[in-house]
C-alpha cells in the first residue's frame, strides 16, 4: 500500500503515418494510457492493439476508469486479479487483455518514478546488460517477393544485423512462401540473421515441408 491514488485516466490514439513506405510502424496505430495521481506522478503505458479494434480497446479503458480513480497504483497484483476475475463479469477477451497491458505498464511506470528507480529493480533486478535488436519485417500489403526483399535490404542498410519476416499468408502455396524467403535471403546476404515467424498461418504439414526446404538458407 502507498499514499498514491489515481486521479484520472486518459487515452491517446496515434494514427499511422501512411507515408507509403510499408514499414510495420508506418501502418500501425498506437494507443497510449496516461494515469495521473494525487502526488503529481504520471504513469504512461502502451496497449497492444489490433488493426480496426483500437477504439474497442480504448473503450475498455474508459469503462475501467470509474474503478481506477482513487485506486492505489502500487496494488498491481490486486488489479490483475480483479480485472481478470471480476471486470466484465469475469469473461475477458483479447481486447480487454490489450487494455490491461497498457494500464499495468502505466502503474509500473508510476511506481518506478515514486521510488526513483528503474522498473526492472522493482521486478527483481536486471538480467541483461544489453539486448539484441532486430528488424521486424512486415509483409502486409506487399504484392511480390521482390518488394519484401527490397524492404529487408533497406533495413540492413539502416544497420540491423538481424531480420524477422512473416512469409506465410492464408491460401498460399509452398512455392510462393519459399520464393519469398529465398528473395529475402538473397537481398540481405548470409551475414545477416534471418528469422521466420509462421504466425498461425500454416497448416502443420505445410510448416514441416517449408522448414525442410528453407533449412539450407540458414534460418535462425
What is each of the regions a protein language model found here?
Residues 104-141:
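Glycine-rich, aromatic-flanked loop segments that form ligand/cofactor-binding clefts
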Residues 36-114:
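Metal- or metallocofactor-binding catalytic centers and their adjacent structured scaffolds
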Residues 11-14, 38, 66-69, 73, ...:
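Generic secondary-structure signature for well-ordered alpha-helical cores
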